[in-house]
Design a protein with these regions (language model features):
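Phosphate/pyrophosphate-binding catalytic cores of soluble transferases and nucleic-acid-acting enzymes
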Residues: 1-303
Length: 303
């Protein structure tokens, strides 16, 4: 019988994960293991809606502002770091919360053993991307690994370039490293999904973008503008503001695009989450209902 339980909380961006997670963490008196691939960067707390200093005083958080934009970090590294944290915790319950699909999947199911990319290979491929463009990089991937080319998100330069880096560094296809074998974990997993009525969620997203602008996101984007080609800034919010800072759009157009692209990302998140039938879905305002479910699940697994 497994003696530890990992509670996983996720949901689309803007749904209200942070406050719900804080209340659940306080109930169990455990820290929050953050699962957000952008909130790890210390330079962009506003645009990533990272937990505030006040929220982090309420509950200890891991993986918030602990890296710089230039740092290389991956789902594979995250998997190992989180497993080490869970193993070192003396409490029977650990709490993982966030919206990064790959991070959550890496912890729950494991990730394939992909080779670490050499810095010179990464630099070479990023220069090729900048010089030749994403379409040409997709064509190259089609030549080197046609199987992965069929399934990769070809609008996501990070995914395309990473697959190419593997192909070029190892001389093998990226597909050959993907076993998709689910790894056994030494803990039980309870999966909680948070969602709201679609109109309510979209209104929250639209308002949150306006709040971010009010809190200083434009100034934040201006500070990191010299680093805008970094993959860590290839994300909703900053891409649109960089276009504004380049004089390609007005501020109103940039804000509209951020809202629209964030809503699109929320839909993508929900599509991915719904594939996993282990998630039990709740409105994030119904904390007591969530806690009752968690306690019931823990009780059932301990029998």
């Amino acid at each position: 019988m497994k003696n530890k339980t990992l509670i996983v909380i996720t949901g689309p961006t803007g749904v209200g994960k942070t406050e719900a997670t804080l209340r659940i963490a306080e109930h169990f008196n455990v820290p929050v293991i953050n699962a957000d691939s952008r909130q790890i960067f210390s330079e962009i707390p506003i645009g990533t809606a990272a937990p505030t200093a006040e929220q982090q005083l309420r509950v200890q958080h891991y993986f918030v502002g602990n890296h710089h934009l230039e740092d290389y970090y991956s789902a594979s590294l995250y998997e190992q770091d989180v497993l080490n944290i869970i193993n070192s915790q003396h409490t029977p319950i650990s709490l993982l919360s966030g919206g990064s699909m790959m991070y959550i999947d890496a912890v729950c199911n494991g990730i394939d053993d992909i080779p670490t990319i050499l810095p010179e290979i990464r630099e070479k491929m990023m220069k090729r991307l900048e010089a030749e463009g994403l379409e040409q990089m997709c064509n190259l991937l089609r030549e080197l690994d046609p199987e992965h080319w069929k399934i990769v998100d070809r609008n996501n330069p990070r995914r395309v370039i990473h697959a190419l880096e593997i192909c070029i560094q190892t001389g093998k296809t990226y597909t050959s490293f993907r076993s998709n074998t689910i790894k056994d974990r030494p803990f039980n997993i309870i999966k909680i999904g948070l969602n709201r009525d679609r109109d309510e969620l979209y209104n929250r997203i639209n308002q949150r973008v306006l709040d971010m602008i009010e809190e200083g996101m434009i100034e934040e984007a201006l500070q990191v503008y010299p680093k805008r080609t970094l993959n860590s800034l290839n994300t909703v919010g900053y891409k649109e503001l960089f276009e504004y800072l380049d004089g390609l759009t007005t501020l109103d157009e940039a804000i509209f695009k951020i809202q629209s692209n964030t809503r699109r990302y929320a839909r993508k998140q929900l599509t991915w989450y719904k594939k996993d039938t282990a998630f039990q879905w709740f409105n994030p305002d119904n904390i007591e209902e969530i806690l009752n479910y968690v306690h019931t699940m823990i009780s059932n697994t301990s029998k």
